[in-house]
């Protein structure tokens, strides 16, 4: 790993993390939840009903007319004419909007929660590998450490029960941007802005964590480089990106 060029190492880490995340998901849950036409596991697979709420929100949103904010579902919350925003059903607005755009070519029965959970495991592994790659240089320790994140008990406890809250990759990518930004004295503004906007459309629960990393990096950057405008742009831009996503959704 030490002999690899920086860009090569990044791709190796991403591939390693993706494969371990994929292996963890398939090992734990198999392939049944990945079938978009199979929603039996949603209705009967768990004793926790949150996933029912998420799925019902998606079904109502899919059968609603387009309006603004984008995540508003007028097929829900009768008799309210404007319906309700699917943020309140934790139906991952960004993902729901994406699949609603594709709805005309999708089958009548379509659940994407299994596919999103698979993506969570893959992204969790990728983010973990990047974080560990800042400190470890041998393949075996990197793989072992990444596997611990891929099989994280906290992740497993949330997976397929409260799908939005298993998006731990958001926090890990924010941690990576903070650690690398601190090491290289860079702000990584687009990364934090993107994470904030993404997070609001997945679950705002992780937004304070992303904002804290942005604030820490902004303060350290201001102290060490004296580039106050960039530091302000990092933190306040992160907050603004989250707010803008909230307005749109």
PLM-predicted stretches and their roles:
Residues 92-96, 138, 185-189:
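Coil-to-alpha-helix initiation sites in intrinsically disordered, low-complexity, charged segments
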Residues 1-39, 231-240:
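Start-transfer (signal-anchor) and selected internal transmembrane alpha helices
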Residues 108, 222-229:
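Transmembrane helix-loop junctions in multipass membrane proteins, especially transporters and channels
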Residues 23-124, 152-156, 162-167:
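Membrane-interface coil-to-helix junctions
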Residues 118, 122-134, 141-182, 188-222, ...:
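Membrane-embedded helix bundles of polyisoprenyl
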Residues 4, 69, 73-76, 219-223:
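Short helical patches
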Residues 102-106, 135-136, 202:
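A broad structural signal for alpha-helix termini and local helix breaks/kinks
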């Amino acid at each position: 790993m030490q002999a690899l060029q920086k860009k090569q190492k990044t791709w190796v880490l991403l591939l390693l993390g993706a494969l371990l995340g994929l292996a963890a998901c398939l090992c734990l849950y198999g392939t049944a939840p990945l079938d978009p036409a199979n929603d039996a596991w949603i209705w009967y697979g768990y004793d926790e009903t949150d996933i029912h709420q998420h799925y019902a929100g998606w079904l109502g949103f899919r059968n609603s007319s387009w309006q603004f904010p984008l995540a508003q579902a007028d097929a829900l919350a009768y008799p309210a004419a404007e319906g309700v925003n699917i943020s309140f059903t934790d139906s991952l607005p960004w993902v729901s909007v994406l699949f609603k755009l594709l709805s005309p070519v999708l089958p009548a029965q379509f659940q994407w929660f299994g596919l999103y959970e698979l993506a969570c495991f893959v992204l969790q592994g990728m983010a973990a590998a990047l974080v560990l790659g800042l400190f470890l240089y041998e393949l075996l320790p990197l793989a072992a450490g990444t596997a611990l994140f891929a099989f994280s008990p906290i992740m497993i406890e949330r997976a397929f029960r409260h799908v939005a809250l298993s998006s731990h990759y958001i926090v890990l990518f924010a941690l990576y941007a903070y650690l690398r930004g601190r090491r290289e004295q860079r702000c990584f503004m687009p990364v934090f802005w993107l994470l904030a906007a993404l997070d609001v459309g997945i679950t705002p629960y992780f937004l304070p964590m992303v904002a804290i990393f942005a604030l820490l990096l902004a303060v350290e950057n201001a102290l060490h480089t004296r580039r106050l405008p960039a530091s302000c742009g990092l933190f306040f831009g992160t907050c603004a990106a989250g707010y803008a996503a909230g307005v749109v959704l």
